[in-house]
């Protein structure tokens, strides 16, 4: 009898244990598979590119701008404080950071050049989008967006060369979810002139750079720019929310940056920080934080990074050959080396205005060499005369002798052949230290670095465009006659 009871108890225990194991197995089977990340899966890459935008976000310390979405993105990712484009104008800059090559090396340095002469990229140089396509990435430059957003992407490319194949495979957001992994861009026009955005910033409270006169026109213009930045942020928020709603956020690296500096008189088209220094924020989902520099949310990175480094970095991270042949260098990933000691920039013809400027910047100093110093900073430029209210204000105040000492260089008849600035002591680059004997050696060091860069990268800037081509803004065929000042105002984009 006792043996029968013991056997019965053993059978019950075995049955209970079996049921418990089956129940546990059932619970495990019911766990969402989304919580397990396949680290061999290639991440999606989404670039959010703002036109003509400096580091004027709340997370960079700018006042009177409302940027909660980009500030949150910075809190969840890495914010770079010393990220520089290699050109202060869109077409040359984009030609560089989409190839990972200096625009001066590949013949793409003059603004909007080679549009009608069939010019192609040098052998071995490719767009990042084409490299990623070969690695199985679907590529898109988004124009068509969800109707609920209420806006479209600009689809801007603006390259100074001709392609045999389209730069991207699609322009539709709706294609992304069904074509992974993807590399996509959304280009935002909000911070490109003319500024059109709801009013938020108080002109009386905006922080205007000290080289501009403290004038109502200046304050209004700067406030409108910051309002455009706030509107840009609102639209970025819609993109990030859509990414999450579609379940794409956990496998998408999001990159936000500016294509060149802000469209102000001493910004865009010039080789100061105001023309070359732009924001860079990268958000890496926790599921794919495998490489160094990707591990800490809310990190602030103060290394020097060039925009051409983006192509090299994402080519490397996608495990695509060719990154080691670029001028850019990876700044994230297993093969990223020490950070840069110097970044370089160049400005050549923009519109009808011919300048040749070269610059090298270290962490603390900037050296600028002007090969065309006979011209004024306010050299004739139809685009700026029509769209920059401060441009014309400066001329008016100069005629009335109402400009302060920091603004006078803006209206001088010529520009210095050389400029040298201490960015730590003088972040707005207002005090030219080129003749300071105490800095003789450090200036010489920067001169040598620029000479070395010009030589080693085979800078093509010394080969000037034919005069007629320059006059026609890069066209080899005559341009159609321009409209009169009133009708054309605000029409021309650059």
Where are these regions (language model features)?
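Extracellular, beta-strand-rich glycan-interacting domains
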Residues: 423-425
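N-terminal secretory signal peptides that target proteins for export/translocation
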Residues: 1-11
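Formylglycine-dependent sulfatase
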Residues: 2, 27-418, 427-448, 452-455, ...
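Bacterial N-terminal signal peptides
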Residues: 12-26
């Amino acid at each position: 009898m006792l043996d029968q009871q013991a056997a019965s108890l053993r059978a019950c225990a075995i049955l209970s244990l079996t049921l418990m194991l089956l129940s546990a197995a059932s619970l495990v089977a019911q766990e969402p598979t989304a919580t397990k990340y396949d680290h061999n899966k290639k991440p999606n890459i989404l670039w959010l590119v703002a036109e003509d935008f400096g580091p004027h976000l709340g997370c960079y310390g700018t006042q009177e701008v409302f940027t909660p979405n980009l500030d949150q993105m910075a809190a969840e990712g890495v914010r770079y404080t010393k990220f520089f484009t290699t050109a202060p104008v869109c077409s040359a800059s984009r030609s560089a950071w989409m190839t990972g090559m200096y625009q001066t090396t590949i013949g793409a340095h003059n603004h909007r050049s080679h549009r009608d002469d069939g010019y192609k990229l040098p052998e071995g140089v490719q767009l990042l989008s084409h490299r990623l396509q070969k690695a199985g990435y679907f590529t898109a430059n988004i124009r068509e967006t969800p109707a609920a957003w209420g806006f479209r992407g600009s689809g801007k490319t603006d390259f100074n060369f001709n392609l045999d194949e389209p730069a991207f495979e699609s322009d539709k957001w709706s294609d992304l979810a069904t074509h992974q992994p993807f590399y996509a861009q959304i280009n935002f026009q909000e911070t490109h002139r003319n500024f059109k955005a709801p009013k938020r910033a108080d002109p009386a409270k905006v922080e205007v750079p000290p080289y501009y006169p403290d004038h109502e026109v200046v304050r209004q213009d700067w406030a409108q720019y910051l309002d455009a930045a706030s509107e840009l942020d609102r639209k970025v928020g819609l993109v990030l929310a859509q990414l999450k709603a579609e379940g794409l956020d956990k496998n998408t690296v999001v990159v936000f940056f500016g294509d060149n500096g802000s469209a102000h008189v001493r910004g865009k088209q010039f080789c100061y920080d105001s023309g070359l220094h732009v924001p860079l924020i990268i958000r890496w989902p926790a599921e794919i934080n495998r490489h160094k520099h990707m591990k800490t949310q809310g990190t602030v990175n103060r290394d020097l990074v060039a925009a051409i480094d983006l192509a090299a970095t994402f080519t490397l991270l996608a495990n695509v050959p060719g990154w080691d042949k670029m001028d850019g260098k990876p700044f994230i990933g297993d093969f990223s080396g020490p950070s840069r000691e110097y970044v370089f920039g160049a400005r050549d013809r923009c519109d009808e205005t011919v300048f040749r400027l070269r610059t090298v910047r270290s962490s603390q100093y900037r050296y600028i060499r002007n090969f065309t110093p006979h011209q004024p900073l306010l050299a004739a430029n139809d685009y700026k005369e029509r769209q920059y209210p401060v441009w014309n204000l400066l001329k008016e105040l100069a005629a009335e002798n109402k400009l302060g000492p920091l603004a006078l260089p803006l209206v001088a008849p010529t520009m210095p052949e050389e400029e040298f600035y201490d960015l730590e002591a003088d972040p707005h680059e207002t005090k030219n230290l080129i003749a300071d004997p105490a800095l003789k050696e450090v200036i010489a060091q920067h001169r040598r670095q620029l000479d070395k860069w010009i030589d080693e990268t085979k800078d093509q800037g010394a080969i000037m465009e034919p005069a007629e081509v320059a006059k026609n803004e890069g066209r080899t065929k005559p341009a159609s006659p321009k409209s009169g000042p009133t009708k054309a105002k605000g029409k021309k984009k650059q």
